[in-house]
Design a protein with these regions (language model features):
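Helix-hairpin-helix/helix-loop-helix acidic hairpins
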Residues: 11-71
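Transmembrane and membrane-interface helices of multi-pass
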Residues: 1-9
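Solvent-exposed soluble domains appended to multi-pass membrane proteins
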Residues: 52-72, 78-299
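A feature for loop-to-transmembrane-helix boundaries and adjacent hydrophobic helices
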Residues: 2-3, 18, 211-213
Length: 299
C-alpha cells in the first residue's frame, strides 16, 4: 500500500499495521436498508424533482442553445485543483491579503457557470476527494481511516468514467505524481479509465516547492500543458467524445514559509500564495477548447 497507510506500519510494525487495515475493509450494512426502503423514499419525492429537466443557469449552454442544435456528447475536462478554494471569502471575517489572490478565479466566474462544493479533505488525502467526485459516493459511509482507492475500489464499479464509456466516450486520467501513490494505477482502471498519465510519463515539466518535497511538485502551468497534450492526443487518435480527468499537485500540503519566495507570500499563510496560479492554468486549458466546434466542460 502507498500513502498514509504506511505510517501505521512504520510506527507500530507490520502485524499491527496489517490488522489495523483489515478493520477498514468491511462496510457494514445500515439497519433497515433494502431496495424496498429506497423505493419507499423515492415514492415520497415529487416526480418533477426526480430528474432535472430545466437548465440550472440562465446563461448556460443548454439554456441559450435550441435543444435540436445542442451537442449531445460534449468534451469533458474534469480538473481537480489540489486544495484550491476562494480564500477571498475570508475577508468577511476581517482577514486581508497583500494581493488579490482570487482575481483570475473571479474573472473565470464572469464567463462560466459555477457553484459550491464541500470537500471531504484539505491539503492531502486526495483519493478521498477523487472518489467522491468520480463516483458520487460519500467517504462518510466508509470505515473511519479507510482510503477508498486502496481498500474499496478493487473491482470495476459504477463511476463517471465507466458510465461515460457506456455512452461512447474515451477516457483518460492525468496526475502529476507517482502512479502507485494511493494505488491509482490499480483503482483507475476499475473506475473506467482507459489510460493513465502519471509523473513517470511527464518530461521537461517545471517543479516548485523543493524545500519540503525533495523532488519538487509539478506547477499548475506545466500540468495545464500536460492536459492539453493529452487532449490533443485523444482527439487525433479517435472520433469518440473525450472525458479527461486531471489532478494537480502544486498546492499540496505542507504549507510553510520556506516553500515560496518573498515576493509570492501573503500575510496569513503560504497556502494562499499557491492558489494564485490555478485559475490561470484553467484559462490555459480553456483557450484551445474555445476553438472547438462543440461545447467543452472544464470543471
Amino acid at each position: 500500500m502507498h500513502g498514509c497507510r504506511t505510517a501505521t506500519t512504520g510506527y507500530y510494525g507490520v502485524i499491527t499495521g496489517f490488522m489495523t487495515n483489515l478493520t477498514n475493509l468491511e462496510i457494514s450494512k445500515p439497519e433497515e436498508y433494502s431496495q424496498e426502503a429506497v423505493d419507499a423514499l423515492l415514492d415520497n419525492v415529487d416526480e418533477s424533482q426526480k430528474f432535472a429537466t430545466s437548465p440550472l443557469y440562465s446563461t448556460s449552454y443548454s439554456a441559450v442553445t435550441p435543444k435540436d442544435e445542442q451537442v449531445k456528447q460534449p468534451t469533458i475536462i474534469y480538473v481537480m485543483d489540489e486544495s484550491y478554494w476562494d480564500v477571498s471569502e475570508l475577508e468577511q471575517y476581517g482577514i486581508t491579503f497583500d494581493t488579490d489572490v482570487s482575481k483570475n478565479l473571479h474573472a473565470l466566474q464572469q464567463t462560466s457557470a459555477y457553484g459550491r462544493a464541500y470537500s471531504p479533505s484539505f491539503g492531502g488525502g486526495t483519493c478521498d476527494v477523487e472518489f467522491e467526485a468520480l463516483t458520487g459516493y460519500s467517504v462518510s459511509f466508509l470505515p473511519s481511516g479507510s482510503k477508498p482507492y486502496q481498500q474499496h475500489v478493487t473491482k470495476p464499479m459504477f463511476a463517471m468514467p465507466n458510465y461515460l464509456k457506456l455512452k461512447g466516450y474515451q477516457t483518460a486520467a492525468v496526475h502529476c505524481f507517482w502512479a502507485k501513490y494511493w494505488s491509482r494505477d490499480k483503482a483507475y482502471p476499475n473506475l473506467g479509465f482507459d489510460d493513465f498519465i502519471s509523473l513517470e510519463d511527464m518530461h521537461g515539466v517545471t517543479k516548485v516547492r523543493k524545500h519540503y518535497w525533495t523532488n519538487g511538485l509539478v506547477t499548475d502551468d506545466s500540468m495545464a500543458d500536460q492536459i492539453i497534450q493529452q487532449y490533443e492526443s485523444m482527439k487525433s487518435s479517435s472520433d469518440k467524445p473525450i472525458f479527461l480527468h486531471a489532478v494537480t499537485m502544486q498546492n499540496h500540503t505542507n504549507y510553510n514559509k520556506d516553500n515560496y519566495p518573498d515576493d509570492e507570500r501573503v500575510k496569513v499563510l503560504s497556502h494562499p500564495a499557491g492558489l494564485k496560479p490555478a485559475p490561470w492554468a484553467r484559462w490555459k486549458i480553456l483557450l484551445p477548447a474555445s476553438g472547438m466546434q462543440m461545447p467543452c466542460w472544464a470543471n
